[in-house]
Amino acid sequence: MKFSENWLRSHVPIQATRDELSATLTAIGLEVEEVTPLGESLGQVVVARIVEAVRHPEADRLQVCSVDAGQGELMQIVCGAPNARAGLVAPLALVGAKIGELTITAAKLRGVASNGMLCSAKELGLDSDASGLFELPDDAPVGQALAEYLGLPDASIEIKLTPNRADCFSVRGIAFDVAAACASEVVAFDAVAVAPVSTRSLAVELDAGKDAPRYCGRVIEGIDPAAKTPVWLAERLRRSGVRPVSLLVDITQYVMLELGQPMHAFDLETLHGPIGVRRSRAGEQLALLDGRQVTLDDSFLTITDAGRAVALAGLMGGLDTRVTETTRNVFLESAYFDPAAIMGRGRKLGLHTDAGHRFERGVDPALPPQAIEVATRLVLELAGGTPGPVVHAQLPEHLPQPVHIRLRRARIARVLGIQIDDADVVRMLRALGMHVEAVAEGWEVMAPSRRFDIAIEEDLIEELARIHGYDRVPTTLPGGASRIAMPSETQLDELSVRRQLVARELQETINYAFVDAALLERWQLTEGLVPLANPLSAELAIMRPRLLPGLVATLGRNAARQAGRVRLFELGKVFAAAADTGAAPGESQHVAAAVCGDALALQWGEPARKVDFHDLKGDLMALAAASGAQLEFQPSTQPFGHPGRSADIYREGVCIGWIGQVHPRLAKALDIDVDVIAFELQLMPLVQRTLPRAGELSRFPSVRRDLAFLVPDEVSWAAVSASVRTTVGPLLREVQLFDRYVGQGVEPGFKSLAMGLILQDNSRTLTDRDVDAVVADVVAVIEREHRARIRS
């Protein structure tokens, strides 16, 4: 954004110097890229009129001009500019004037005396145009100092705007920020409505919904086509990087630069029906102002006249309806278009216009009525004419609504680390154009409609920091007590679980937390599932209810690639739908393992064999021993497990998992042709542990007695061992199952269980009588409670 320093100061009275203003702009986020001083050395440059211009007798490209500079007599100036002619008003540098590094002196050019220099805009440092003399209006006062006439000295300031600051694509928008930073106030803006004189108007129809919710238009008739752009307006445009074209076009450009509202002027006589705003039709063609004929798709917004497209909304007008030097009747347009409807459309056609640049970032939706009044007043003042009524079409339901934000004192202090006085908070926010009301904990703030970037409390805090000054926010290192949690001695951490399993020659794998619904159906896990609203694919549409489906699938892929021994484990979350509708799904941490193939790595010391249930159970018991968990196993009825080789896992009477061989039918459905042994447990019940207590070591010897019982097939070792522990009490150090036998010598429906009892007392040596009494009690209890008999 480029603008005139004097123009900005006309909107916000400040005492800051140019350097201070530049520093302030950069400090508040409007980074100054370039400052170009204008007219600081024009003390001896005056307005002059060429009375006569004749060809130089010795040079075809030079002219000898008689110039009236208000000095009382005509001055002779030799000039080589192609536009030098009688009647032209242009700047004249008198003898002694310093133009840049050049000091003007009286001289002879090809033998003809020259007592000054007629200047171009570039030579004066006012513009880049060096094609000819700087042409001034015919009514410019001859002899007046040029600096006084042009309102110099001044400076052209160019700032770099971030995409969120669309409100600063106008002089007035910048003025609000400067006023807030310099503790000043923006000059009140006069947007008094111009009363209509005629009744002529054009109806407006909005057919683009939210893309074009507001459109203002006005007819002005009887404009003087010969009216010229006044020098003050042309200079403000020129110093803002816009070259003056014609009065009507210059007025629309001026309003855009001052207020931030792009406008367009149509030649009324080229319009033949009501004005419409609609989406373009695929294949529709339009001749643009730059002379190009473009073919549109259906993504553009168009301004239409009796159905035909006459302009690209928010981008560029049409060639057929443009204003010309003969235009006497115009239709002024001022509208609000949704940024999303304009964004990227210009790039499709290779267009980059000031209007499009503003609309795609967001223009104040409240501006169109004000802008059309300002433009009307300028047209009437500078070119005359008869205004009609303003036609104001809008779709209120699609206009952006004001945002009310609660700003808390405590939040300001917490985010910025400093306290800002209440009075300063209110002053800064109001200077930025915000409506502020005090409430108990702070303020209720409503951002102005031009500030699309303010939506939450943190946006307001950022504004305060920006205006208050980032340099006034102290640099402090983060502080506070360490929040590193102390490791719990009553819980085995996940790293320890991983290390235990790795020590058992298991390898960790990490699978997706999403699984295929078809896979879960094969596992018969179809209840309490949590589907994803936006899955990555149909095969990853369900949050996993167990780890095993994904883990076994991974094991199968490895086994299918000639991996003879696969041992995998995984720690991860599983998910279940909540019982209450609308509640968040439940999640818990599980640990699972799956193995197949050889039980032992390739070696020569032991014969090769396949892994079985007891191998993986041994791995699980080693993990349980690390936490001191006493696990119990009961026959399982899980449909995915082998009916005779799987068990539910209990701790303290609560089922916490499953272990066993995957059902052969399921393995076959998964294209796995080897036996798969697996377990899965809830992690938290497994890793909870009781702190060990130191006990007295007995100084007396222990005694071992071996017993073998014939027990019914349905009686488990867990039940038998529990009876033994209850019966023997503190004398029992350990009970071990060392043999299980079914076959010859054992009647059908029974099995042989052989156990070893290790007994010890802390106070004395046990005698044979003591041991025999304990054994007799054990035999009696097992025979009575489990319908067993001692095996002879």
Curated annotation (Swiss-Prot):
Keywords: Aminoacyl-tRNA synthetase, ATP-binding, Cytoplasm, Ligase, Magnesium, Metal-binding, Nucleotide-binding, Protein biosynthesis, RNA-binding, tRNA-binding
Family matches, as Gene3D superfamilies: 3.30.56.10, Bira Bifunctional Protein, Domain 2, Ferrodoxin-fold anticodon-binding domain, Nucleic acid-binding proteins, Phenylalanyl-trna Synthetase, Chain B, domain 3
Gene Ontology CC annotations of this record: phenylalanine-tRNA ligase complex
Domain tRNA-binding: 39-147
Keyword Ligase: yes
Keyword Membrane applies: no
EC number annotated for this UniProt entry: 6.1.1.20
Cofactor section: Mg(2+)
Listed PROSITE patterns: B5, FDX_ACB, TRBD
Binding of Mg(2+), residues: D453, D459, E462, E463
Subcellular locations according to the entry: Cytoplasm
Reactions performed catalytically: tRNA(Phe) + L-phenylalanine + ATP = L-phenylalanyl-tRNA(Phe) + AMP + diphosphate + H(+)
Highest taxon of source: Bacteria
GO molecular function, one term: tRNA binding
SUPFAM superfamilies: Anticodon-binding domain of PheRS (SSF54991), Class II aaRS and biotin synthetases (SSF55681), Nucleic acid-binding proteins (SSF50249), PheT/TilS domain (SSF56037), Putative DNA-binding domain (SSF46955)
Domain B5, chain residue ranges per copy: 400-475
Cofactor note: Binds 2 magnesium ions per tetramer.
Domain FDX-ACB per the UniProt entry, residue ranges: 698-791
Pfam family, any one: B5
BP-aspect Gene Ontology terms: phenylalanyl-tRNA aminoacylation
Sequence similarity: Belongs to the phenylalanyl-tRNA synthetase beta subunit family. Type 1 subfamily.
SUBUNIT field: Tetramer of two alpha and two beta subunits.
Protein name: Phenylalanine--tRNA ligase beta subunit
Organism per entry: Xanthomonas axonopodis pv. citri (strain 306)
